[in-house]
Amino acid sequence: MAIQKGDFIKLSYTGRFEDGRVFDTTDEELAKTEEIFNPRGLYGGDVVIVGAGHTIDGLDEDLEGKEVGYTGTVVISPEKAFGPSNPKLVETVSITKLQDRNVHPGLPVEIDGKRGVVSRVIGRRVTVDFNSPLAGKTVNYEYTIEKLLETETEKIQGLLALYTGIREIEIETADGVAKIYIPTGLTFNQRWLMAKNRVATELFKYADFKEIQLIEKITAESEAQELAELTAEAEAEESSEPEI
């Protein structure tokens, strides 16, 4: 069955620049080899909803009409990747604004809270590009559609993993109602606080739920773990305080 908008799929991919450099991948070993490994990242494939904006436009569009098991490569222009480079974000400043005076093209810098990369040095003047490193780049994605998710539980857990980085969260579903038991540690997680409304909205739109219940689950075990973590943090802070 061909993939269409609204489908929940598991997707493995590797994104490369035109020169072959990898900037993103779901392959943990490749990420380590290319020195882009993120210890907080979730590897092994992402669950995305086709057409929901979970990937860049060019990749999202290419998924439609493919079959589960499909492996291929798509070349994506900046307009449908990470956007064109904005010339207004390229500024020329005095070298005195930089802490590091050993300035050269390619040097990452931060000026007035903005991060950029030095693109040119002429005398005492430095041109800094504050665009995203991905802006204006043609990229290619090599990807595999591993699975079409069909059960309610798979869809919810996949979406939660995408937004929280946690694969296993307890879920119950019945009669159009989803009960999601939120672990204590996630309750005050900034990433989760910003994402939970979007999770609910997408489950209403793409999975036909009529009610989402977010239930904070506290157990003796989780409380003990939380206490142990807080105690360890407090001891670490104490040990780092200078003696008077």
Regions from the language model: what does each represent?
Residues 1-244:
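FKBP-type peptidyl-prolyl cis-trans isomerases
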